Amino acid sequence: FRSMQGSWLTVNYDPWGIGVTYSGYLLLGVSMLWMLVSRGGEFRRLLRHPLLKKGGMFVLLLLCLGSGVHAQKRSLPALARKQADSLARKQVIYNDRVVPFNTLARDFVLKLTGKPSYGGMTPEQVIGGWLLRPEVWQNEPMIYIKNEALRRLLHLETPYACLADLFDGEKYRLQKFWKGKQDHHQKMTSLEKAIVEADEKVGLILMLQNGTLIRPLPEDGSVEPVSDTKIQAELLYNRIPFSKLLFMFNLTVGMLAFFRLLYRGLRRSSALSDSSGRIVALSFSSRLADTFFPFSLYAAFLFQLFGYGLRWYIGGRIPLGNGYETMQFMALCALFLACLFRRRFPFMVPFGFLLSGFALLVSYLGQMNPQITPLMPVLVSPWLSTHVSLIMMSYALFAFMMLNGILALCLRRSARMLMLLSRLLLYPAVFFLGAGIFLGAVWANASWGRYWAWDPKEVWALITFMVYGAAFHARSLRIFRRPLFFHIYMIVAFLTVLMTYFGVNYILGGMHSYANA
């Protein structure tokens, strides 16, 4: 090993400890379930509370959804559109699975340019142009260089470089800027990351030109082609930008609905004059708006479910293997919960739109990999899907409680009723998190031979569990009976969720950091 530190191999044998630990998990799980079903319990009492039986408020009318398309018209040699379209359905081996050629071509263009198409041409036309006339395409500025420092080193005036810009004769210009690290665990600077990213793009072009990128199915039949139905499903999935469309839609509707909710609350407290109230009411309080919001919520849920189901069908596994997929699942959970509680708690609707919209925005803009790839063997486990599903359900509920707290700070008169709602959601949220931690421990024991390793993700999940668990003890800790303190606590407590999910993945690392890979 270059680090000269060697490797540690451990063997664990702990039959008594595992038995006692699993028994504790089981007892705690039974007790959590009993707290939910016990007739005299706090959870059932909250369900019967008169304040939570009151109807809700809000409605709104229109939204505007638009997306800009930037097409560069250039006289570049490329495949004819008809030939390119016929090539899109051809099956190749890519990322260790059989895919339509469209998937490979789309990822190629997306990797180079940051967009799924280029210059008004389809991905197949672009990749065909690189194969047929590389001497022309190597002078086309289509390699996106985001880092300004690297652009200055390369003397680029725009964010896009051509392949020829990265070579000085036969010398590779990026090589002189890169100083390889002796310690591979040492963190790279932003410039070094940009150099590595640009080098990967150059490597992708070179792989295409030397024939190693495109791998057709072998003629000996050792790799079976996939069905036409699955090919058509993947082409449809590549064609529709599910995340982009839905995060724009959800955030737009959610913000309008949230402002409507604030307006209704302020009207009840006579904060707005009657004249202004009449004007706003004319805009927002119509029967059409009353129909529009529920319809939009169900439509958004079905659209997200359709996209998620397509990804499941195409990949042949539950999409919970990386950060992109868990954000997609969290958005689905948020929309599902909003649909579930819409009639009893109408103010959950804007929360569902906002939470799902931000989750989809994070998956769209963040450093999360949208490619569909097979899971590493350790992740191919029935424990994984249940473990991640429960954890993400709990995160969605915690996010609802955080938004509920923000709303309560704006609508002080409704603070007590909103506190009761948050306390009601607290039970399933903490129990989902606890059950997810338990199943994660069982999965870890089956995969690595130990159920707890003090990994950063495990530690922060436990911290989150304990922080939210403290709010159960309102009888002992009387301060939790105060609505204002309770809501502020729920807002601050959500920081532990953010640290558990994003902080561990991108800052602390650990065994769970593959979630963003």
Model-derived features: where do they sit?
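Solvent-exposed, non-transmembrane regions of integral membrane proteins
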Residues: 1-283, 287-517
